[in-house]
Amino acid sequence: MLIPIHDLSQPELLFYTKLNEHQLSQYNAPNPLGYFIAESPKVITRALNADYTPVSMLLDKDHIDAESKALLDLLPETLPIYTASDALLTSLTGFHLTRGALCLFKRKETNSIKKICALAKRIAILEDIV
């Protein structure tokens, strides 16, 4: 569902406007899953294909084109998709967005070390890599 926005002070945009990556990842503490933001239709599509759950999207209103249209078709119809001008999005990020799209996703639980080791044939431990 497309929702036009004209300023960044709307509470629905908190995840995009007020929280950094660390704060997003810890948002549901003590539940360690949290959230992350994917940028660009290609990265968003990869996250969707990896079964991450989208929460909302922020999209440049001028980038609703073939690539974004294909992406929008992958998203649930009920997903809030906030649309804004390039100038407004640039004021948020400080730079021109690649293909004008950001998408908020829920993080998935990661495999435990025990599970990874149980499934692995060979394991490498790297330390102090520069």
Predicted features along the sequence, with ranges:
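Boundary-proximal intrinsically disordered activation/regulatory segments immediately upstream
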Residues: M1-S68
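Extended, non-globular alpha-helical segments
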Residues: L2-Q23, P30, P80, S85-I116
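Structural motif
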Residues: Y35, V55-M57, P80-Y82, G100-C103, ...
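A generic local structural motif
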Residues: I44-T45, S68-K69, L89-T90, N111
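RNA substrate-binding interface of SAM-dependent RNA methyltransferases
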Residues: N49, E109-V130
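Short, well-ordered coil/turn elements that cap or connect secondary structure elements
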Residues: Y52, L75-T78, L119
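Flexible, acidic active-site loops/lids enriched in D/E/S/T/G that coordinate Mg2+ and/or position polar
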Residues: L59, L72, F105
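Short, aromatic/basic amphipathic alpha-helical patches
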Residues: A66-T78
